[in-house]
């Protein structure tokens, strides 16, 4: 082996190093191997004529080239096929992603390949490490949920409901709606369902709310400190833990950074929640804070909308085995922290966490945002377009990098990612890129998908967020103008009209014109009718109904995925019968499974008719007392109560008198106040005093009664010890009503809020005379009662009735007497005609009151049972004896039973007499000897007391009202 020295060659030029190599190509294959940081050796086959070795010491640029690689690759030999099929051209991969290409007659060339993947390695398990969860929890304060510096921190709009239906699985006793395989809109846009969704209670899209954390344990690693280990196997995208901590703003974040640095805290636990908001889990949090960093992670962090808050969770990136450490790529600048060494041990490890080393080499955008922007990784772009996207340069901003890459066109499947990213987007340049993808799309299916994925609600929030930038506003209005417009339902639900309305006067001519045209188009749409959703009370106790769910536990039952109701149904080709050759005249379903269904009565009875049963036969009756064996086909006649017409006429007369009295009552003339000349205070005072004129008559009477009450109470207090308390209160109310009605009837009330001194004296005098008479009557009643008790005369009930009438005589006062008291106050007690007149009117009032009470009792009491039918037919097995006492005995002896008894049905009367066609002795089981015995008696009593005479087969009643022949 001969060495080759070339000390004058530049160390930084890799091309010169390759060109300086002198390689002789022979028939055999030549391999060139360059190790990372090692020597480069050129080997030949056994028949080679010469060999040449190039070391890294000779060309220092080789070391720089090898050390500059980010991803290390294994060496491989990739031949290049030529047109004649000979593998004369060779590709040799040296360290990392560098390949040496050698072609006949051409110097070797170095090329960089970006499509090589990291070699898959088996996951490293940490089952040998002990569980250090208790020790780790002692280093911080455990929290269940995030705390917020103020109520506006972490706030986001949420008024969206999914269209999924409840899917109850009886075998699991769970609601499987909104699962991973479903088409749930909320789940696709990273929104959790709340209690008022149509998918039912406790659906599968409530993982944050129910804290469905994975089974994990804290372990203590050798170099990374505490870490998180999976105790069970995890499936892809499974929710592992929520990142819980204190949500603070940017000023507090920077202050805590300095504070923790002064305290000597090396490990910071800050995560960016949104623009200007951070989650600090340094001193308060949960086990999610122990999830370490890795350059090849098995987890990822995602943000979800839960209610009105934005929350952060850790999810599985791939299938994870039990014992693996749970890690995710921080992929962000550590907010000014110094870069730390990375101990993940992955082949693609950058060597540092945070700082410029990691930030400049990779974008800070999350994978979800990159996919939403249409920027895929290099491997995916190799199969999509011819031109591969370039990598991010050192020091290049994310916005500049995204601008330099052409995004993919938006398809129907990509709408979900775009709308989910737009829902949580707080960066303007990212929002503009996402909106541009939607705006450039002309496919109607994609636009329908955008509307379905809460398009109006999400664009409404973006319109509110960027309303000061007219370019972004105009971009959103153009998207809204391109939406398919069928109904106004989604527009009303999103409340976007109230956001667009102020834009018509914003000052920008383009925005004003576009907003006005959009509102005009929306106004022409109709509102589609939808069944209103039942409002659930969250505090109500859940009542389980036995008819709520029908749980079938058969093995053949299969669960259908929850699909959106707006999705078009699948079209199936029509099919013929399963077995067309089978012919059967028998019933299709001869076996009944379960309880029989309730069958409604085929031919119900006409209104007013009821049915009863006697000796196995059915007869019909009505409330008036009519009975028949024949089924009626017309409604039953109404039963007339005796004296009903007279009472109706009397009531109608009373109503007419009241109406006529109201018409004859003169209306008060409202005095129009003049133009106020006083100050504003006087005008407002007069307005308050005259307000009673706008009240109704009933309210004015109540106001006037309250004005009279103090003067009436003054008199009532004088009679406290002379009358019982209850009687005194009742008399006071009655006398107040009498005075108020009398004064209003005679137009003596000028102002119901005040009365003059003269009126006060008259009121007191009237009340004093009234109560004096009441006391005298009460004493007389007590004296008579004592005498009757001493003599043992009438019963106590009679005394109570007479006493009641006496008291009523004192209470009932006429309006004429009140007028007389007002005209002549001093002569009220000495006028016998007024007293007699009052007594006569009181007697009339008591008579009318008694009649009204009797009518009320008659209405509320049970109606009189109808009269019994004619006697039973001849030849019955059992007949009433001549000493029968009435209807009850007759029913008991004939064994009458109810067949159909509605709630309002009267007591069924006995069955009617059978006609000739119904009097078959053999069928009814009657005895001819009993019939002959009754005929020999010539007469027998009927249930109502009439006597019937039996002569030659003819029965006739001695009283009017019952006729018929048997």
UniProtKB/Swiss-Prot annotation:
Q: What is its main location?
A: nucleus
Where are the stretches annotated Disordered?
Answer: 1-20, 67-92, 540-595, 666-691, 782-966
Q: Name one GO cellular component term.
A: chromatin
Q: Name one GO molecular function term.
A: histone H3K36 methyltransferase activity
| Localization in the cell | Nucleus; Chromosome
Give the superkingdom in one word. Eukaryota
Q: Which reaction does it catalyse?
A: L-lysyl(36)-[histone H3] + 3 S-adenosyl-L-methionine = N(6),N(6),N(6)-trimethyl-L-lysyl(36)-[histone H3] + 3 S-adenosyl-L-homocysteine + 3 H(+)
Biased composition (Polar residues) is annotated at 67-87, 672-687, 924-934
AWS domain location: 157-212
What's an example GO BP annotation here? regulation of DNA-templated transcription
| Start and end residues of each WW domain | 603-634
Compositional bias annotation for Pro residues: 863-874, 905-914
State the family named in the UniProt similarity comment for this chain.
Belongs to the class V-like SAM-binding methyltransferase superfamily. Histone-lysine methyltransferase family. SET2 subfamily.
Described purpose of this protein according to its UniProt entry: Histone methyltransferase that trimethylates histone H3 'Lys-36' forming H3K36me3. Involved in transcription elongation as well as in transcription repression.
Name it: Histone-lysine N-methyltransferase, H3 lysine-36 specific
């Amino acid at each position: 082996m001969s060495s080759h020295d070339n000390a004058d060659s530049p160390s930084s030029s890799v091309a010169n190093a390759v060109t300086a190599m002198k390689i002789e190509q022979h028939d055999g294959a030549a391999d060139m191997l360059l190790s990372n940081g090692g020597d480069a050796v050129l080997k030949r086959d056994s028949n080679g004529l010469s060999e040449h070795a190039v070391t890294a010491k000779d060309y220092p640029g080789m070391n720089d080239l090898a050390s500059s690689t980010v991803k290390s690759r294994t060496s491989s030999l990739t031949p290049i096929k030529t047109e004649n099929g000979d593998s004369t051209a060779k590709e040799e991969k040296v360290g990392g992603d560098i390949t040496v290409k050698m072609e006949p007659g051409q110097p070797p060339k170095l090329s960089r390949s970006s499509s090589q993947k990291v070699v898959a390695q088996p996951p490293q398990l940490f089952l040998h490490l002990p569980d250090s969860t208790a020790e780790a929890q002692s280093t911080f304060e455990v929290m269940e949920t995030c705390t917020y510096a103020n109520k506006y921190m972490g706030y986001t709009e949420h008024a969206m409901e999914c269209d999924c239906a409840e899917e109850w699985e009886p075998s699991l006793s769970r609601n499987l709606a909104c699962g991973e395989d479903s088409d749930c809109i909320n789940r696709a846009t990273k929104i959790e369902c709340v209690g008022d969704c149509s998918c039912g209670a406790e659906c599968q899209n409530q993982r944050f709310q129910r804290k469905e954390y994975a089974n994990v344990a804290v372990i203590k690693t050798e170099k990374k400190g505490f870490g998180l280990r999976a105790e069970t196997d995890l499936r892809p995208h499974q929710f592992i833990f929520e990142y819980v901590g204190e949500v603070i703003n940017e000023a507090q974040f920077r202050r805590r950074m300095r504070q923790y640095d002064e305290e000597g805290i090396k490990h910071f636990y800050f995560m960016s929640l949104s623009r200007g908001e951070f989650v600090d889990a340094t001193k308060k949090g949960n086990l999610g804070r122990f999830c370490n960093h890795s350059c090849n992670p098995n987890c990822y962090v995602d943000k979800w909308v839960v209610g009105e808050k934005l929350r952060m969770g850790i999810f599985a990136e791939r299938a994870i085995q039990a014992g693996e450490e749970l890690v995710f790529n921080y992929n962000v600048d550590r907010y000014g922290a110094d870069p730390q060494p990375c101990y993940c041990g992955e082949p693609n490890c950058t060597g540092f966490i945070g700082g410029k080393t990691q930030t400049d080499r990779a974008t800070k955008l999350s994978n979800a945002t990159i996919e939403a922007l249409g920027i895929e990784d290099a491997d995916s772009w190799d199969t999509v377009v011819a031109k591969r996207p370039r990598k991010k340069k050192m020091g290049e901003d994310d916005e500049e990098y995204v601008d330099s890459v052409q995004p993919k066109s938006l398809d129907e499947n990509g709408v979900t990612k775009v709308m989910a990213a737009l829902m949580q987007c707080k960066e303007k340049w990212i929002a503009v890129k996402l909106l541009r993808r939607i705006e450039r799309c002309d496919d109607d299916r994609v636009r329908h998908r955008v509307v379905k994925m809460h398009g109006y609600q999400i664009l409404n929030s973006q319109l509110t967020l960027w309303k000061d930038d007219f370019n972004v506003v105009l971009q959103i209005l153009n998207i809204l103008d391109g939406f398919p417009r069928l109904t106004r339902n989604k527009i009303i639900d999103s409340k976007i009209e109230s956001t667009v309305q102020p834009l018509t006067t914003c000052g920008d001519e383009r925005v004003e014109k576009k907003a006005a045209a959009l509102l005009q188009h929306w106004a022409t749409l109709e509102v589609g009718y939808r069944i209103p959703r039942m409002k659930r009370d969250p505090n109500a106790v859940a009542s389980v109904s036995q008819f709520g769910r029908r749980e079938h536990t058969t093995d053949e039952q299969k669960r259908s995925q929850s699909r959106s109701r707006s999705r078009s149904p699948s079209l199936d080709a029509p099919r013929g019968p399963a077995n067309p050759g089978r012919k059967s005249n028998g019933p299709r379903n001869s076996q009944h499974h379960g309880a029989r269904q309730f069958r409604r009565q085929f031919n119900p009875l006409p209104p007013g008719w009821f049915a009863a049963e006697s000796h196995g036969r059915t007869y019909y009756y009505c409330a008036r007392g009519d009975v028949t064996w024949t089924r009626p086909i017309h409604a039953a006649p109404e039963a007339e109560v005796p004296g009903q017409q007279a009472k109706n006429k009397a009531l109608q007369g009373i109503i007419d008198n009241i109406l006529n009295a109201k018409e004859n009552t003169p209306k008060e003339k409202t005095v129009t106040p003049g133009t106020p000349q006083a100050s504003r205070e006087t005008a407002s005072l007069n307005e308050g005093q005259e307000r009673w004129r706008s009240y109704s008559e009933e309210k004015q009477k109540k106001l006037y009664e309250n004005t009279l009450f103090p003067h009436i109470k003054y008199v009532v207090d004088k009679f406290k010890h002379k009358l019982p308390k209850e009687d005194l209160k009742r008399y006071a109310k009655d006398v107040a009503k009498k005075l108020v009605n009398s004064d209003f009837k005679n137009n003596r009330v000028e102002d119901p809020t005040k009365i003059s001194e003269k009126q006060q004296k008259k009121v007191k005098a009237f009340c004093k005379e009234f109560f004096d008479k009441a006391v005298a009557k009460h004493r007389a009643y007590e004296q008579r009662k004592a005498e009757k008790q001493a003599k043992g005369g009438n019963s106590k009930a009679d005394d109570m009735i007479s006493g009641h009438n006496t008291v009523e005589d004192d209470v009932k006062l006429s309006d004429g007497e009140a007028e007389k008291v007002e005209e002549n106050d001093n002569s009220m007690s000495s006028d016998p005609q007024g007293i007699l007149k009052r007594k006569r009117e009181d007697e009339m009032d008591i008579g009318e009151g008694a009649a009204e009470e009797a009518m009320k009792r008659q209405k509320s009491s049970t109606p009189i049972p109808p009269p019994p039918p004619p006697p039973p037919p001849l030849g019955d097995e059992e007949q009433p004896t001549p000493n029968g006492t009435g209807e009850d005995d007759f029913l008991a002896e004939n064994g009458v039973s109810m067949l159909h008894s509605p709630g309002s049905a009267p007591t069924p009367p006995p069955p009617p007499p059978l006609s000739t066609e119904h009097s078959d002795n053999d069928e009814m089981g009657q005895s001819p000897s009993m019939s002959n015995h009754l005929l020999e008696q010539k007469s027998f009593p009927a249930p109502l007391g009439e006597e019937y005479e039996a002569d030659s087969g003819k029965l006739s009643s001695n009283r009017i009202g019952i006729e018929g022949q048997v």
